[in-house]
């Protein structure tokens, strides 16, 4: 007969009852009920936050973009082909962040900072939010350090300072990217880390930029964020924010960073596409009502930090494309009002053979003059005045049949001054060379040189300045000033050449 150990069974039941865990694990989940065009509609997830990362059953990640009464509009960060109706979606309680660090220098990454250059994974223990708050007023100080672009026309008349936001604007194929790349090339040896964000560009164009940076030795201090034309609208939308997060790492560590957005017109178009698919009300040019905030919250992150925060800086060079030179369109006017100045590139000047095709008349730098080196300030004032007078005289001379000798001389000098502002692509000039060339032009040393021979004259002048580097170049680089002593050295060089 079977003996039942009732005491043992009772003690086991008692033990189980005492140690019973009645805690319920709750997961905030939703269900996919519509998917298409990179947009997913999710039912449920009542506690989801705007901008929260959502995890789909098959591993995809999306961002909660529209919080509506009965559902959530989610934009996907990847491919939507594997997502099906009825799939479970979980909230993560987190917002987007990307890994950051020095190891990203020299690498090409996507909008989520994943490497796409085939050089292996990037191991980083630090992360930054894709959209953190911008530095406050107390956290900033005024712009006072120059950021040399190496382009004479910009450094002389539209100077840029570290921490400034300077818009590069113009029609397609007018050299906007070339100006930005020249600026990156000129940061070599200046302890400025660069981030180039390509939004909606052709893959071949991005490859060309990479090749240029590699050939010139600039990729070592540059991070390239690629959101090519074949990526989703969401990836193109977040690429500038991710690129800024990578640059902010250097700024908050006391270094100087430069970020180029090429270009924000494409980002606005991607945002418009997402908004229209989410059925947001369209406004002017079919852009949503918050498209100004799209760019203002991005560009406000550029700053010159106060000494208490390390004194780092983040300089932004956003690029915006215009149609037929129309700067009064929606996106151009928005970005012009957000930035601290603009460099306007004109297709007429470009087609006339002047490169870089900068229209100095309507280009402006609102805060850069405070950062311009004294040496440049001393020679650039005269250049601006003479070019302005030349532009006025040139327009007048078209209607005049005979001109007096003084006017003819002024026109001849103006043509030579315009000639010295021409510069080959990917050939940035150092500060001492720029000062020497402008001084030669404004003080009449080029008046007897024919316009065709000016490029060769400039080449020989830069060689002469290199030979006298200890007396002229080194002094200007160390003091950033152009005193009588340096002027006498320069006059001797010019008279000898």
UniProtKB/Swiss-Prot annotation:
It is found in: Plastid, Chloroplast thylakoid membrane. Keywords: ATP synthesis, ATP-binding, CF(1), Chloroplast, Hydrogen ion transport, Ion transport, Membrane, Nucleotide-binding, Plastid, Thylakoid, Translocase, Transport. It is a peripheral membrane protein. GO terms for cellular component: chloroplast thylakoid membrane; proton-transporting ATP synthase complex. It is an enzyme of class 7 (translocase). The record marks 363 as: Required for activity. InterPro entries: ATP_synth_asu-like_sf, ATP_synth_asu_C, ATP_synth_asu_C_sf, ATP_synth_F1_a_nt-bd_dom, ATP_synth_F1_asu, ATPase_a/bsu_AS, ATPase_F1/V1/A1_a/bsu_N, ATPase_F1/V1/A1_a/bsu_N_sf. ATP binds at residues 170-177. Its main location: plastid. F-type ATPases have 2 components, CF(1) - the catalytic core - and CF(0) - the membrane proton channel. CF(1) has five subunits: alpha(3), beta(3), gamma(1), delta(1), epsilon(1). CF(0) has four main subunits: a, b, b' and c. Belongs to the ATPase alpha/beta chains family. This is ATP synthase subunit alpha, chloroplastic. The lineage of its organism: Eukaryota, Sar, Rhizaria, Cercozoa, Chlorarachniophyceae.
């Amino acid at each position: 007969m079977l003996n039942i150990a009732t005491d043992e069974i009772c003690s086991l039941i008692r033990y189980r009852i005492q140690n019973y865990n009645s805690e319920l694990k709750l997961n905030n989940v939703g269900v996919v009920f519509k998917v298409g065009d990179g947009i997913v509609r999710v039912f449920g997830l009542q506690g989801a936050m705007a901008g929260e990362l959502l995890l789909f059953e098959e591993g995809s990640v999306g961002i909660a973009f529209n919080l509506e009464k009965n559902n959530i509009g989610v934009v996907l960060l990847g491919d939507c082909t594997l997502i099906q109706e009825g799939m479970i979606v979980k909230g993560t309680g987190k917002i987007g962040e990307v890994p950051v660090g020095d190891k990203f220098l020299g690498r090409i990454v996507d909008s989520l900072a994943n490497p796409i250059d085939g050089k292996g994974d990037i191991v980083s223990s630090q992360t930054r939010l894709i959209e953190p708050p911008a530095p406050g007023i107390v956290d900033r100080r005024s712009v006072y350090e120059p950021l040399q672009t190496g382009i004479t026309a910009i450094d002389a008349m539209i100077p840029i300072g570290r921490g400034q936001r300077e818009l590069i604007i113009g029609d397609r194929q007018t050299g906007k990217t070339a100006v930005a790349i020249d600026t990156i090339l000129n940061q070599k040896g200046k302890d400025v880390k660069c981030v180039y964000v390509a939004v909606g560009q052709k893959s071949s164009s991005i490859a060309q930029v990479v090749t240029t940076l590699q050939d010139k030795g600039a990729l070592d201090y540059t991070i390239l964020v690629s959101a090519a034309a074949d990526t989703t609208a969401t990836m193109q939308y977040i690429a500038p924010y991710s690129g800024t997060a990578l640059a902010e790492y250097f700024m908050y560590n006391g270094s100087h960073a430069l970020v180029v957005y090429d270009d924000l017109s494409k980002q606005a178009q991607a945002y418009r596409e997402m908004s229209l698919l989410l059925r947001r009300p369209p406004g002017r040019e079919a852009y949503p009502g918050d498209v100004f905030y799209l760019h203002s919250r991005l560009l406000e992150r550029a700053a010159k930090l106060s000494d208490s925060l390390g004194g780092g800086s983040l300089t932004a060079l956003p690029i915006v494309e215009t149609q037929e030179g129309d700067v009064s369109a929606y996106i151009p006017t928005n970005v012009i009002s957000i930035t601290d100045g603009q460099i306007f590139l004109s297709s007429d000047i470009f087609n006339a053979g002047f490169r870089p095709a900068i229209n100095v008349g309507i280009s402006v730098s609102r805060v850069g003059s405070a950062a311009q080196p004294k040496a440049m300030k001393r020679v650039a004032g005269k250049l601006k005045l003479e070019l302005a007078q030349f532009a006025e005289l040139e327009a007048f001379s078209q209607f005049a049949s005979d001109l007096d000798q003084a006017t003819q001389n002024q026109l001849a000098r103006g043509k030579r001054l315009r000639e010295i502002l021409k510069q080959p692509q990917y050939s940035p000039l150092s500060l001492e060379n720029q000062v020497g060339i402008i001084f030669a032009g404004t003080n009449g040393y080029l008046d007897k040189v024919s316009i065709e021979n000016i490029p060769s004259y400039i080449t020989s002048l830069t060689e002469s300045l290199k030979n006298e580097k200890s007396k002229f170049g080194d002094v200007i680089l160390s003091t950033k000033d152009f005193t009588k002593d340096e002027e006498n050295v320069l006059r001797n060089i010019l008279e000898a050449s």
